[in-house]
Design a protein with these regions (language model features):
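Short amphipathic alpha-helices within nucleic acid-binding modules
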Residues: 15-17, 56-68
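Short amphipathic alpha-helical segments
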Residues: 13-37
Length: 99
């Protein structure tokens, strides 16, 4: 199961956010067995979209709890919240397209 996360980043903070994501958030996720499989920044430079992967939907609560208790997450402190104005999270399941 994949989870697509779309964040509206505060004005003028995208470069700082991308750096924080690449050096702190992504490694902290991957250290807990939550791979980040894709990232994008929209053309207006105010939205950051990323996808993280779980074995299945049942895996999400335990993995998220372990992540929030990890040293990697704790070391981020308030930095993520200082960058994010709005957050939207969608759970995605791979399916077959109808003919």
């Amino acid at each position: 199961m994949d989870q697509m996360r779309s964040y509206t980043i505060n004005k003028g903070m995208m470069d700082s956010w991308v750096n924080l994501f690449e050096t702190g958030i992504k490694p902290a996720h991957e250290a807990m067995g939550i791979p980040v499989v894709a990232t994008w920044v929209n053309a207006d430079h105010n939205q950051f979209i990323w996808v993280r992967r779980f074995a299945d939907g049942d895996d999400v609560p335990a993995k998220e709890a372990a992540f929030r208790e990890s040293d990697g997450f704790k070391s981020l402190g308030s930095q993520p919240g200082e960058h994010i104005a709005k957050m939207d999270i969608q759970s995605l399941e791979q399916g077959k397209l109808a003919a």
